[in-house]
Amino acid sequence: TGYDAKKIPSFALQSEPRKKGELASNWTLMPEFFLNDGKAGASLAVPEGTSLYGGGEVTGTLLRNGKTIKLWNTDSGAYGVDGGKRLYQSHPWIMGVRKDGTSFGILFDTTWKAELSSMDDKIELRSEGELFRVFIIDRESPQAVVKGLSELIGTMPMIPRWAMGYQQCRFSYSPDSRVLEIADNFRERRIPC
């Protein structure tokens, strides 16, 4: 059995991609798919010296080589769950930057709980769910890969002008008169509250 887009629609794609041409004969980023007890996975060999980034919000360095990330996010106050390795955003996405600066992005099109491992020689996603698709974007730079990703999944709408650069912490206000003072200040500045 294989992947069926009608049975398992994508939550990531803006629209179904269309074929743009033939695959280059020297193409090296070939995913290998596997099933273990009904749980799907995929792995891809990566060129030596490739720097890997992605996977979502976790503590540690941006460079993900040699790391395994659990893709099952949580609201982790004080980074207490799994030592900050499962924070607010989980992304089944890895970007690789080769030694020559050319880059690729890999989107594992699944929302199942998963582990994303980015070893020096391969990238592997092991999900707890059914078969999924893998999309590979291979371009001349990291910027071009991100542009390709936005063409595939879409972009976010522009935030309201008042929100540009604005951060309002709501962790603790005491006493209640302070909350009312802040709300009055918001209204004076025409910021929704």
Task: List the predicted regions and their residue ranges.
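Catalytic and substrate-binding clefts that recognize carbohydrates or anionic sugar/phosphate headgroups
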Residues: 1-163, 170-172, 176, 183-188
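Primarily the dimerization/phosphotransfer
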Residues: 192
